[in-house]
Amino acid sequence: MVIIRLARGGAKKRPFFNMVVADSRNARDGKFIERVGFYNPRAAEGEESLRVKLDRVTYWQSKGAQPSDTVKKLIKQFDSRQEVAGS
């Protein structure tokens, strides 16, 4: 099964997550199909903390990819930010 999940990167005590499309059998930080965004929970003021390629996420969901619970929350958060910025 194809899933959309977070792959951890960054250094010790400085997490950084890539939002990736991957086969569920692969390791969390292992091989992936496509990178569709990132999440930086420790972004400094003025830095971008979240970016999602919504068109690619929609494409993969149409192909049957299942987002993890955390990814669902982040997509919803990013989408609401886009609506506020677009208004």
Swiss-Prot record:
It holds the Pfam family Ribosomal_S16. GO terms for molecular function: structural constituent of ribosome. PROSITE patterns: RIBOSOMAL_S16. One of its GO terms (cellular component) is cytoplasm. The keyword Ribosomal protein applies. It comes from the Bacteria. The keyword Zinc does not apply. InterPro entries: Ribosomal_bS16, Ribosomal_bS16_CS, Ribosomal_bS16_dom_sf. Keywords: Ribonucleoprotein, Ribosomal protein. PANTHER family: 30S RIBOSOMAL PROTEIN S16 (PTHR12919), SMALL RIBOSOMAL SUBUNIT PROTEIN BS16M (PTHR12919:SF20). Belongs to the bacterial ribosomal protein bS16 family. This is Small ribosomal subunit protein bS16. It comes from Nitrosospira multiformis (strain ATCC 25196 / NCIMB 11849 / C 71).
